[in-house]
């Protein structure tokens, strides 16, 4: 992998442009490819909407074609809310995040990924199923997980086996693992096991973010995945990234300035208005630039919500390595953890002092006889 960029803060325009050109995102593969004329098919699921279709497409990637049907294809007597309408989506591995120049040393190159939930510990040989069949079932499962997230409902292994991948129990670890990976990389949704005995799971936004970009209706799709991608790029660039670098990454995902996307809407609005208003990003003119050039920085909400160690673990997981493989960022993440711990201690001390003062004041007060 290319060497990691130097961790420099916001620099003069000339230096920043030079660094951006040498770093780039060479070799990155697009995690999303959008096709406007996606076809639809019928799902075999019995307990989630018929508009969650199976895909007949074959892929060797880790995330699969998701081809929701149009609302008109859902039967009128189906009382379950329709899932969102979207174009065909394909997620290839490695993703843009996985292709970022993260390598800072040769150490830790053989590090293993973090352990998965107990349900996923043993993955069967995928050769026992055709790749196209795996793709189809993972697609069904991702659609099911998205619906459950939209409905804010937990899920169980038994429910998945009954509703989505019936007759595939032996392959549940493989299918569930790949569907969970797709949920994380594309939509920024973590599938967390909350009961190892009963194999029950909840779906939550990754990295502790309190934003998913969804509207009030169930037609909306979570946008946390693309937000994490942008914040990751800004992080490894030193919290200050030229606008051109961001658009380069988005273009590889099939997102273009001024072109409406069926899931994300108009990308420029998302970047420069929605996320700026949500305080996840700052968008400003590069000082002294003429003609004007712009750059992105982390906003106050990103700094408040995202632990750098969590983000580094996310990037390491995507790259199949260990956070210690990136000593420069790991050192910064440790510093962030220490600062947060000190803030918690200070807050606790202040609360204790206030409670003590209040108690003393109450105890010294006496009623007149």
Swiss-Prot record:
User: Can you say where in the cell this protein is located?
Assistant: Nucleus
List the residue ranges of the region (Disordered).
1-131, 340-369
**Cellular component per GO, a single term:** nucleus
* Gene name linked to the record: MAGEA10
Q: From the UniProt record, which GO molecular function terms apply?
A: histone deacetylase binding
Which keywords belong to this entry? Nucleus, Tumor antigen
- The organism's place on the tree of life at top rank: Eukaryota
Bias (Low complexity) occurs at 39-62, 348-369
Tell me the lineage of the source organism: Eukaryota, Metazoa, Chordata, Craniata, Vertebrata
User: Would the keyword Nucleus turn up in this protein's UniProt record?
Assistant: yes
Q: What is this protein called?
A: Melanoma-associated antigen 10
């Amino acid at each position: 992998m290319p060497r990691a960029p130097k961790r420099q803060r916001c620099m003069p325009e000339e230096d920043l442009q030079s660094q951006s050109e040498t770093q780039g995102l060479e070799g990155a593969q697009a995690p999303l490819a959008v096709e406007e004329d996606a076809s639809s098919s019928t799902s075999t699921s019995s307990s989630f909407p018929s508009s969650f279709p199976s895909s007949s497409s074959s892929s060797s990637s880790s995330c699969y074609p998701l081809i929701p049907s149009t609302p008109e294809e859902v039967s009128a007597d189906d009382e379950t809310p329709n899932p969102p309408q979207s174009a065909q989506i394909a997620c290839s591995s490695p993703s843009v995040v996985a292709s970022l120049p993260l390598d800072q040393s040769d150490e830790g190159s053989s590090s293993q990924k973090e352990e998965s939930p107990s349900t996923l510990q043993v993955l069967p040989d995928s050769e026992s199923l055709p790749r196209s069949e795996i793709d189809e079932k993972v697609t069904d499962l991702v659609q099911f997980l998205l619906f459950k997230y939209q409905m804010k409902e937990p899920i169980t292994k038994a429910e998945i086996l009954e509703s989505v991948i019936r007759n595939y129990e032996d392959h549940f670890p493989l299918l569930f693992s790949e569907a969970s990976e797709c949920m994380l990389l594309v939509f920024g949704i973590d599938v967390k096991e909350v009961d190892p005995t009963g194999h029950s799971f909840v779906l939550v936004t990754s990295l502790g973010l309190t934003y998913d970009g969804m509207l009030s209706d169930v037609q909306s799709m979570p946008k946390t995945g693309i937000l994490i991608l942008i914040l990751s790029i800004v992080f490894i660039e030193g919290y200050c990234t030229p606008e051109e670098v961001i658009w380069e990454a988005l273009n590889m995902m099939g997102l273009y300035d001024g072109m409406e996307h069926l899931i994300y809407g108009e990308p420029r609005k998302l970047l420069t208005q929605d996320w700026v208003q949500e305080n996840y990003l700052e968008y400003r003119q590069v000082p002294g630039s003429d003609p004007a050039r712009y750059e992105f920085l982390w906003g106050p909400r990103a700094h408040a919500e995202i632990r750098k160690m969590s983000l580094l673990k996310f990037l390491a997981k995507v790259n199949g390595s260990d956070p210690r493989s990136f000593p420069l960022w790991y050192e910064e993440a440790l510093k962030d953890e220490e600062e947060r711990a000190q803030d918690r201690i200070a807050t606790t001390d202040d609360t204790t002092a206030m409670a003590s003062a209040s108690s003393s004041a109450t105890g010294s007060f006496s009623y007149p006889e």
